[in-house]
Amino acid sequence: MFKAIVGASTLQDALDSVSVLVDECKIRLNEGELAIRAVDPANVGMVDLALDTAAFESYTADDGVIGVNLSKLEDFIGMASGDQLVELELDEETRKLNIQMDGLSSTLALIDPDSIRQEPDIPDLDLAAEIMLEGAQLDRGIKAADMVSDHVRLRVASDTEAYHIEAEGDTDDVDFRLDTDDLIALTAGEADSLFSLDYLKDMNKAIPKDAEVTIELGQEFPVKVHYGIAEGYGEITYMLAPRIQSD
């Protein structure tokens, strides 16, 4: 069974974090949290979402799994304003999700979870550098890089203790540097990796500008990007594979 009441903005923030990478996903309706883990079709970008029951007005679940079309679900939730409450209830006989908000009722046909891509394992990586910054700072760096290139270098030099978002185009270059005083926190270690800017742009769309974002970075390793939603009761982690440069 599954029945929950949650603020529309909380649910939208959670779904946005996943829909930037995939069109459909499994939602695990655990007793203690709602959880989603998914990887994009190219196996380049991954998302892991955990939304604690404390983020809901009410929440009852018995560890079920449903499959959803994210675009359709977001369309339904988008009918509510941010401060409205959305009521969700699973009809186990029809395998449909009943959605109610402010006088509006709708039903969403679910997808067989077995037909959806298997949830990925998130590797335990030993990444040398950890950067904590504001979502607005990350947004500025990504937008600057996008002006000149389709890939971006994320780099920390342990000697200067600065975080760089760099891009090199055919004729133009960008270097957005954030020193220790500009950041919320920095654990400096040698870290330098190149990434597809398209994926980072998509992930960046979901990250609130006022969020505290933690980035874990290594030498030609995947990058992990963490941020919270729902007043800290929700945690989102992205992982993005690097573009390996040949010598």
UniProtKB/Swiss-Prot annotation:
GO terms for molecular function: DNA binding; DNA polymerase processivity factor activity. Signal peptide: none annotated. InterPro entries: DNA_clamp_sf, Pr_cel_nuc_antig, Pr_cel_nuc_antig_C, Pr_cel_nuc_antig_N. NCBIfam families: PRK01115.1-5. Sliding clamp subunit that acts as a moving platform for DNA processing. Responsible for tethering the catalytic subunit of DNA polymerase and other proteins to DNA during high-speed replication. Homotrimer. The subunits circularize to form a toroid; DNA passes through its center. Replication factor C (RFC) is required to load the toroid on the DNA. This is DNA polymerase sliding clamp. It comes from Haloquadratum walsbyi (strain DSM 16790 / HBSQ001). The lineage of its organism: Archaea, Methanobacteriati, Methanobacteriota, Stenosarchaea group, Halobacteria.
